Amino acid sequence: VLFTTAGMQPLVPYLLGEKHPEGTRLTDFQKCVRTNDINEVGDNRHLTYFEMLGNWSLGDYFKEESVAMSYEFLTKELGIPAEKISVTCFAGDEDCPKDTVTAECWKKAGIPEERIYFFGKDDNWWIAGEEGPCGPDTEMFYDTGKEKCSEGCNPSCGCGKYVEIWNNVFMEYLKTSDGKYQKLKQQNVDTGLGLERMAMLLQGKKTPFEIEIFKPVMDKLEELEKVDDIASRRIVAEHLRSSMMIILDGGIPSNVDRGYILRRLIRRMTRRLRKLQIDTNQILSLIH
């Protein structure tokens, strides 16, 4: 693993049954770098570096309490209108059954059946890597109010009407090296809530690039640019932040592993600066 891509990675031993020194109910904040979506950066929602907030149950509470807590936090603590929330659950396959239990938990919490969707492993199953702890997940989406892209518009279509805000993973399986699934010794809950995306929604912004983390850099780029290109401004701002966080954690540009990813981010950022016709020597003014 080149970078921490999810909050679960440091906790794998405890998901497998090892006792955590802080107990069975945890919360955490995790710096994450994901480069699988690097070519999507520049749109209204993708980031390479982001901060993930999570809460955990290590053999403690499971689906019903997890769903109830998530619904309460979103609607009561954050004040998100309940009618704006849609959810997805695992549709089931030959390996694991349909997750009707979680769907019923959502109905009990207050989500009507017409806003509960079922999808397969591509959308509602989580595993970090090819093997290890895994399980079905339930994702929470915010309806932005945009027009439907089609009659079949739903949270999985990617048109931008629905924005994912939280993901609860119910880790009750272990995928072995031979591709088989077996039950874990304990049932776990792993949740992940993207800080930047949630800030965007709570501040009434349309993209993460409008929140206070990015706005000063975005404004400076707009001041310096000679060519108006919103996607390039977003890429420069995002890759600058990502590169700085990697360097602060000890990363150095190179031709291999983590260093290559960092080098790639810097090169992409430099190309976009040139596209904006901004002198690359002015990058220090963006950092300050």
Report each predicted region and the residues it spans.
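Conserved small/polar residues in nucleotide/adenosyl-binding loops
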Residues: H288
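Alpha-helical segments
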Residues: V1-R263, T270-K275
